[in-house]
Design a protein with these regions (language model features):
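Periplasmic/cell-envelope proteins involved in peptidoglycan metabolism and beta-lactam response
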Residues: 1-252, 268, 342-354, 363, ...
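Beta-lactam-recognizing serine transpeptidase/beta-lactamase-like catalytic domain environment
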Residues: 53-55, 176-187, 228-273, 278-513, ...
């Protein structure tokens, strides 16, 4: 009887398990014998405009441990400490945890990975992960940026276009044997979706030329910082953009925030005399002056609006053309007085100052220009020559392009297109006209004057051998914290385009706090000259710089 009752209970228990608890117990068993593994998608490649890879993925070994399987942990810790340089305390902590899987080191150098594999230590294993590689290290670092350990973009277009580049992870359920060892068989799998590729507007060779010359000026003049932009004036395409200081995209763990800052789009400064192109363009467009109108430049000293203006060298009578060629502050202010505050402000804004231009890089700032109702009595004597206004290098590049292209403000852009892994086009960026600024006639007349700046005026060191060029020098005193202008801190600049008659590119060079020399015509103009010379020859197919060819 007792046996019968026991048998009945067993049958009842089996019936309960079979029909009421089977799904629960099956899930428990699967958890013990299956492992869900995320499958990493391929992160998209970043190319220059000629489809030369600037960032791509490489398969690397990542080292993991199953702590319970490792014997002689002290010896293993010593070996890994020697090979990987990891702290003993870190290894001791990881290897003494009660886990079935724990990372020790990810995306290893192939030599280190091979050395550990030769040791054949039970309880250590490797999984393939992808590491982001930047083949040109420092080149275009402030454009490209970088991604982190988990291939998530952290800076530059790597961050701004992460949703395009990252792809969609897949997953697989791998079977395990009775000892919990993963078998190379899966029960279910969802294939990852690869990320999309980015094609930039920059040209690797022009970028190299620009960085080479900027780096030389930055070091030769012991500068605090420097920026350069090379742009197609007709479209707004950025052909090169660089800053100093910079950093290595493959080794950014110890980089300062100052080195990572994209100064060309986020640093605000008073432009000084390069800003005179706005005053000059507005005066010609409004028919307030002609090229041959004469201005008395007060022999270098002029008391006006409660302040005293000085020219860097005394001038008497100068034509309007000569006022710009010789960069006369006094002459420029007299021209601005003819134009008036409201019209001057109109042209400052029309040239793109005081608002964001909309470049497809994060961090752009709008700059600073107050409306006339907030001007002081000295503003009409300051703004025309680039004081009381804050600008970026990008805004100057777009502004000088207005003169180069016949009067149009173009939206600058850095992304040419987005493509899938097969190269099929997903998105194509095209030139965008923001608005018309001045007439073609005014642009042509200013172009001739700016050609004279290089031929006869302050920009002689910007003269490009074999090609005509036009441009404007700038030497701006920096503001001290107390609001006064410094006598030993300057921003040297040059903005220009070449060839003058049919411009291929515009170039802006900004050097912050150079010394001992600080004049734009001495510090920045030679950078323009060398970049324009080499870049135009490269574009025309006449000559490739030897250094670029070697690369």
């Amino acid at each position: 009887m007792v046996f019968f009752i026991f048998l009945l209970l067993c049958v009842g228990r089996l019936f309960f398990i079979q029909f009421f608890r089977s799904s629960y117990l099956t899930s428990i068993a699967k958890k013990q014998h299956n492992q869900l593994v995320e499958l990493e998608p391929r992160r998209g490649t970043i190319y220059d405009c000629n489809l030369k890879a600037q960032a791509f993925n490489m398969s690397m070994d990542s080292l993991y441990a199953v702590p319970g399987e490792i014997k002689g942990k002290e010896n293993v810790i010593n070996q890994l400490n020697s090979i990987l340089g990891l702290k003993r305390s870190y290894l001791e902590d990881r290897l003494n945890r009660k886990k079935s899987f724990i990372w020790l080191a990810r995306k290893l150098n192939p030599d280190k990975s091979a050395t550990i594999k030769k040791l054949n230590i039970k309880g250590l294993g490797f999984l393939k992960e992808t590491k982001r590689i930047y083949p040109n290290s420092y080149l275009a670092s402030h454009i490209i940026g970088f991604s982190g350990m988990d291939n998530i973009g952290l800076e530059g277009v790597e961050r701004d276009y992460n949703r395009h580049l990252k792809g969609i992870p897949g997953w697989a359920i791998f079977l395990r044997d009775a000892r919990q060892k993963k078998l190379d068989i899966w029960e279910k799998m969802v294939v990852p979706v690869d990320g999309e590729d980015l094609v930039l507007t920059i040209d690797e060779v022009i970028q190299y030329i620009a960085e080479r010359e900027l780096d030389k000026a930055f070091k030769d003049f012991h500068a605090k910082g420097a920026s350069i932009i090379v742009m197609d004036p007709h479209t707004g395409r950025i052909l090169a953009l660089a800053n100093r200081p910079t950093y290595d995209l493959n080794d950014h763990s110890e980089v300062s925030k100052d080195s990572m800052r994209n100064r060309a789009i986020c640093d605000l400064f008073e432009p000084g005399s390069v800003f005179k192109i706005v005053t000059a363009s507005g005066a010609l467009e409004e028919k307030k002056v002609t090229e041959e109108d004469v201005f008395f430049c007060e022999n270098g000293t002029y008391k006006v609006g409660g302040r005293i203006l000085h020219d860097h060298m005394p001038h008497g009578l100068l034509t309007f053309r000569q006022v710009i060629e010789e960069s006369s502050n006094i002459g420029t202010v007299k021209v601005a007085q003819l134009l008036g505050p409201d019209k001057l402000y109109h042209y400052v804004r029309a040239f793109g100052f005081g608002s964001k231009l909309g470049i497809d890089l994060s961090g752009e700032i709008s700059g600073m220009i107050s409306p006339p109702k907030l001007w002081s009595k000295t503003s009409i004597t300051s703004i025309p020559m680039g004081q009381e206004v804050g600008v970026t290098a990008l805004q100057l590049a777009s502004a000088i392009s207005v003169i180069a292209n016949g009067g149009q403000l173009m939206k600058p852009y850095i992304i040419d297109s987005v493509r899938d892994i097969q190269g099929r086009l997903i998105k194509q960026n095209k030139p965008v006209l923001i608005h018309k600024v001045i007439s073609i006639d005014t642009a042509m007349r200013i172009k001739k004057i700016l050609t004279g700046v290089i031929e006869e005026g302050t920009g002689k060191l910007a003269k490009v051998s074999g090609f005509s060029a036009a441009g404007k020098t700038g030497t701006a005193q920096k503001l001290e914290p107390n609001g006064t202008y410094s006598h030993n801190k300057f921003v040297a600049s040059f903005i220009g385009f070449s060839p003058a008659e049919d411009p291929i590119l515009t170039i802006v060079v900004i050097v912050d706090e150079p010394h001992p020399s600080y004049f734009g015509g001495v510090v920045a103009a030679p950078v323009f000259q060398k970049v324009a010379s080499d870049a135009i020859r490269y574009i025309k197919g006449n000559e490739l710089p030897l250094e670029a060819l070697a690369r």
